From Swiss-Prot:
GO biological process per UniProt: protein modification process
Xref: InterPro entries: aa-tRNA-synth_II/BPL/LPL (IPR045864), BPL_LPL_catalytic (IPR004143), Octanoyltransferase (IPR000544), Octanoyltransferase_CS (IPR020605)
Protein's recorded name: Octanoyltransferase
SUPFAM superfamilies: Class II aaRS and biotin synthetases (SSF55681)
Positions of substrate binding: R69, G70, G71, K72, F73, T74, F75, H76, A143, I144, G145, G156, V157, A158
Something else known: In the reaction, the free carboxyl group of octanoic acid is attached via an amide linkage to the epsilon-amino group of a specific lysine residue of lipoyl domains of lipoate-dependent enzymes.
EC numbers for this chain: 2.3.1.181
Name of the gene: lipB
Keyword Protease belongs to the record: no
Record flagged with keyword Metal-binding: no
Role summary: Catalyzes the transfer of endogenously produced octanoic acid from octanoyl-acyl-carrier-protein onto the lipoyl domains of lipoate-dependent enzymes. Lipoyl-ACP can also act as a substrate although octanoyl-ACP is likely to be the physiological substrate.
Enzyme active site: C174 (acyl-thioester intermediate)
Length: 209
């Protein structure tokens, strides 16, 4: 069974990134076991490889970090559960298929949200996980941005639990103008991070066997 490691407090993004990269190298060179980091970051904007500088609107005193993950700009901060799976897609029980991996991530998060009574969706041509907030109007509740090195995955998923959503106004999230962002709290679901973590671990084992 894959070990989930919760990093305490509000983790610095760059420190966590180095932790991930070091462990990815160990999986590749030393065949270390797969693990999943659960993180709650201090406030930071991160940019993926497809970012456009004009999508960074007004970041104030929040640091901006340019990363090697896929995607565009997003925000990380307190109240957001960030999940970093370090999985070896080249292992016998996995598949060397990045699209399939992302699809499985989506299914994992959708099933976890469904446990709390939240009906979530994927939308064609829009990365991430979405919920309907009004008729024909959707808001993003989770962002996905991954990277793979020699078929070992890192970066991952960020789910808004009780995030300060006003911080997303400093960017165009994921490059989608006029898109809404939401959280479990905003949807009326108040859950402790530890309780949410139990569910994502249970649901992970159903999808990534």
């Amino acid at each position: 069974m894959i070990r989930f490691i919760t990093i305490p407090d509000f983790a610095d993004y760059q420190v966590t990134l180095k932790l991930m990269e070091d462990y990815v190298n160990k999986v590749i060179s030393d065949h270390k076991p797969e693990i999943i980091y659960l993180v709650e970051h201090s406030e930071v904007y991160t940019a993926g490889t497809n970012y456009k500088q004009e999508e960074l609107l007004n970041y104030g005193d929040i640091p901006v970090i340019y990363t090697g993950r896929g995607g565009k700009f997003t925000f990380h901060g307190p109240g957001q559960r960030v999940i970093y799976p370090i999985l070896n897609l080249a292992s016998p029980n996995r598949h060397k298929d990045l699209k399939l991996y992302i699809k499985m991530l989506e299914e994992w998060i959708i099933n976890s949200l469904n446990y709390f009574g939240i009906k979530a969706y994927i939308i064609k041509d829009k990365v991430g996980i979405w919920v309907k907030v009004r008729k024909d109007e959707f808001a993003k509740i989770a962002a996905i941005g991954v990277r793979v090195r020699k078929w070992v995955t890192y970066h991952g998923v960020a789910i808004n639990i009780s995030t300060d959503l006003s911080k997303f106004s400093g960017i165009i999230p994921c490059g989608l103008e006029n898109s809404l962002v939401t959280s479990l709290n905003q949807l009326g679901i108040h859950v402790e991070m530890s309780e949410f973590d139990k569910i994502i671990q249970t649901e992970f084992n159903k999808i990534f066997k």
